[in-house]
């Protein structure tokens, strides 16, 4: 079920070439397109291709490999990674990597026989067994994949600075114990991620404390899914002062707690700045063996400064505290 705090827009990819060269895609896939990052279904290890004599011997067959996002779609012209393996493991128990290439459609000259071919496109991919004969042939891979672009805003449509926003993409299905397999961490906003069609669990983090939103998002083959998450949080800055509007007192230890007393964040300095989810909190400030505290409320979208008055005549000052 798609979370109600998601606003999704689907836009059909105009052509596969457009998807391959869309702004930001190349950078977004840098983790997925490196040759060592392969994750083949049922293939945990493989032997690297051996640097032997060229394959161009008397009897080779040419195989041309192409891939599309959807059935009858246009060929993907860039961003693919092809890996060709022998079908039987060697003495070391690994499948030997016969050949590999990057780009779009690729042709290989191989000894006739059976091979396993893996095509990866970002985080999308497919594996297929092929047969190579003496005659040239073409094999097409349908990746059944699409793109996902994520963004977030604060309550009321307030834009969140991109440097304070990150996403993590997980498999939707939970494993025993409630855990999910992590697909891609630390995704920047407005980055296009290529994924196989399906539902994914997305975690959006605003800041680095407790402003976290979780959503299930569906990726459709051949389409770009744009999802905007709504956070309900605010950036808060705390300072200890001797009087309202005064200068912040240095060397202050800070502890932020929920109204039930659960710790949220600790820091040291004249100021304590952090993003907090909306709700009620207590801020505790310790300076020179004195402890001061104040209750405050975080309202979504309303960034604010919280002053704690260092008034030693009030009951909140505790002398001799450790």
Residue ranges and their predicted role:
Residues 61-71, 148-157, 235-244:
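A short, amphipathic beta-strand motif
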Residues 72-91, 156-177, 243-262:
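Short, ordered, surface-exposed loop/turn motifs in non-cytosolic proteins
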Residues 23-28:
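Sec/Tat signal peptide C-region and signal peptidase I cleavage site
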Residues 102-114, 121-123, 186-201, 206-209, ...:
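Short Pro-Gly-centered beta-turn/loop motif in secreted/extracellular proteins
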Residues 11-22:
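Bacterial N-terminal signal peptides
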Residues 1-8:
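N-terminal secretory signal peptides that target proteins for export/translocation
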Residues 29-50, 102, 121-144, 207-230, ...:
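Structured interaction patches on ligand/partner-binding surfaces of diverse proteins
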Residues 87-104, 174-189, 258-270:
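Short, acidic Ser/Thr/Gly-rich low-complexity loop/linker segments typical of extracellular
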